[in-house]
Amino acid sequence: MKIHREGRSIIFTVFFLLVLLNVGCYLLVFRTLIYLFSLIASACFFSIVVIFFRNPDRIFIGDTKNIVISPADGRVVFIEEVFEQEYFREKKIQISIFMGINNVHVNWIPIDGEVVYYVHQNGRFWAAYLPKSSTENERSTVVIKRNNGEHVLLRQIAGVIARRIITYVEPNQKCRINEQLGFIKFGSRIDLFLPLNAEILVTLDQKVRGNYTIVARLE
């Protein structure tokens, strides 16, 4: 299992602290049962942290023309026509994917094109599955222009636990499916804003896989 670069320092820190904790427990607590419990609990916690930062090798091998690939693992929690007010200032179809703590938290580029807009905004830390998290939470907004001039907006949203959004792209950068967009640490959500004529290929509560599940088809 590959570990994502965003998790290496955290994993090392957690490992070091757990070693100190268990050494201290061994030296100061003279009860074998308590020490064994500490070892087991530490091993379980460390395993969860390592699994969270896993970085799977996923390559989409199909035709990428006119499709929108899921930018993240998770569950579809919202599909609705909304007024997007930050960039488009017009109605779009919003698809929201909630990433639970057990999901891979790598984010992928959903379409081929060029980045034309990127803004990071500080904000609140509401639960990521709530609709208001899209406009009130800490978030990064990326807009990608397709070759035909059409724009698709993607928004990385921090949740209650997630306090750090990593975004690798910047304006004027060419991007394509199979490339990583970024990473959100410890629970989060991704919003997609698509043209009204997009053919939506997912349903509410459907589980999706990043860089694998086709969520929509564009004209």
From Swiss-Prot:
One of its GO terms (molecular function) is phosphatidylserine decarboxylase activity. The active site is at residue 188. Its cofactor is pyruvate. Keywords: Cell membrane, Decarboxylase, Lipid biosynthesis, Lipid metabolism, Lyase, Membrane, Phospholipid biosynthesis, Phospholipid metabolism, Pyruvate, Zymogen. Its EC number is 4.1.1.65. InterPro entries: PS_Dcarbxylase (IPR003817), PSD-A (IPR033175). It is found in: Cell membrane. It is an enzyme of class 4 (lyase). GO terms for cellular component: plasma membrane. The record marks 187-188 as: Cleavage (non-hydrolytic). Is synthesized initially as an inactive proenzyme. Formation of the active enzyme involves a self-maturation process in which the active site pyruvoyl group is generated from an internal serine residue via an autocatalytic post-translational modification. Two non-identical subunits are generated from the proenzyme in this reaction, and the pyruvate is formed at the N-terminus of the alpha chain, which is derived from the carboxyl end of the proenzyme. Binds 1 pyruvoyl group covalently per subunit. The keyword Flavoprotein does not apply. It catalyses: a 1,2-diacyl-sn-glycero-3-phospho-L-serine + H(+) = a 1,2-diacyl-sn-glycero-3-phosphoethanolamine + CO2. GO terms for biological process: phosphatidylethanolamine biosynthetic process. The keyword RNA-binding does not apply. Pathway: Phospholipid metabolism; phosphatidylethanolamine biosynthesis; phosphatidylethanolamine from CDP-diacylglycerol: step 2/2. Belongs to the phosphatidylserine decarboxylase family. PSD-A subfamily. Catalyzes the formation of phosphatidylethanolamine (PtdEtn) from phosphatidylserine (PtdSer). HAMAP family: PS_decarb_PSD_A (MF_00664). Heterodimer of a large membrane-associated beta subunit and a small pyruvoyl-containing alpha subunit. This is Phosphatidylserine decarboxylase proenzyme. It comes from Azobacteroides pseudotrichonymphae genomovar. CFP2. The lineage of its organism: Bacteria, Pseudomonadati, Bacteroidota, Bacteroidia, Bacteroidales.
